Amino acid sequence: MIPNFKIKRLIQERSLRKATVEREVAKSYGLAQKVTSPIIRIPYTYNYTVEGDDKEKELTKTGFINFSPKSTAINGQVNTETRERSIFDILVYNSMLDIEQTFDLSQVNLSKYDKYDLHYDEAYMIYGVSDPNGISSEMSFAVNGQTLDSEGLVTNNSGKRSYIKSSPFTLDLSKKINVKTKSSFKGTSSVAFEPIGESFSTNISSPWPHPSFTGSKLPNRYDISEAGFESQWSLNKFANAIPKVWENNHVNIHQSAFGVNFIQPLDEYGKNTRTAKYALLIIVLCFAMYFIFEILQKKPMHPIQYILVGSAITVFFLLLISLSEHIGYNMAYLISSVATIGLISLYSSFILSSLMSTLVLSSLLSSLFGYIYLILQMQDFALLAGSLALFVMIAAVMMLSRNVNWYALKTGPQSIQT
């Protein structure tokens, strides 16, 4: 069991190494992205006086008022690709989003802000992307047909979230405002959306066939195939607690999010971990085969011989781990199993001193490693298949040794009766 523990420890270390490489790639390419849909913001100034030691002092307070949209519709395409770093393949993506929004501010109550001087001619859009380093092209905003450029980044009070800021435009509250936003950004592992507005819908498609939908809401509809996936979310005002208007950063607009993780169903290290869990089963079944030959041929084997066979099986897992990093799990399993079966069969030919017995043992070992491979491909029935294999082997040992005089084993191999 100690070698098995060491094997699992090695797999964990290699897996952590890959995770470190993934983080390095994400820092330079783009982290997991979280998108905050655009909102309108207008700055304000407020002049007031305070009592000083000798005289009144005039101060000016600055801030901004935020307006959430009535409706938001996001259509996005997320294209995935694999980047090679060292011996690892890292999954990354490039996302292109088209966002259409409607703002109806004619009924918004601004009476609580009457004391402020609102600068409607300096209104601007803000659009949140959690990792601005991943932005791959210039953002574009169109407000009622007027094209606005992006002017840089603004942050919230904590400085932890950044938003792309558009060039200013004049806001007319009496008119309905239609906004179109185009963006393209890169990222890794996942993309999520933070809904704002009374009505919010998102349509995302990608060629990646292994999505995992996460967050505060699952898709209303999705379609997954080998060609990729399409998903659709829709929320109404009852599922979205963001108000129509608020001051500064007094409202947490990041309270809920939903999206998709781009998962690799089972990478080489995951497959190796599953394989290592069957190490004890492989060793037990292999020893059982040797024990059957020991009984049938009336030729006791030394414990050292069992240890050497067990060591060969342990090396099988080391070969599997190291080869799978370079040529993939399936080919690594084939090469490692053939090498291990060949080594054990060659060694056994000298122990058994019988070509027929060696061929039978080689066939049984091939069947064992082939059966274990089939178990590893299963998801729901792996435990059942493994249990059945162990049961059949125990039953075979019991039946083949049913006539053995176990007490006679003490007097030497010549006394064994079958």
Predicted region positions:
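Cytosolic-side membrane-insertion boundary helix
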Residues: 249-283, 302-303
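Alpha-helical transmembrane signal-anchor/signal-peptide segments
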Residues: 6-30
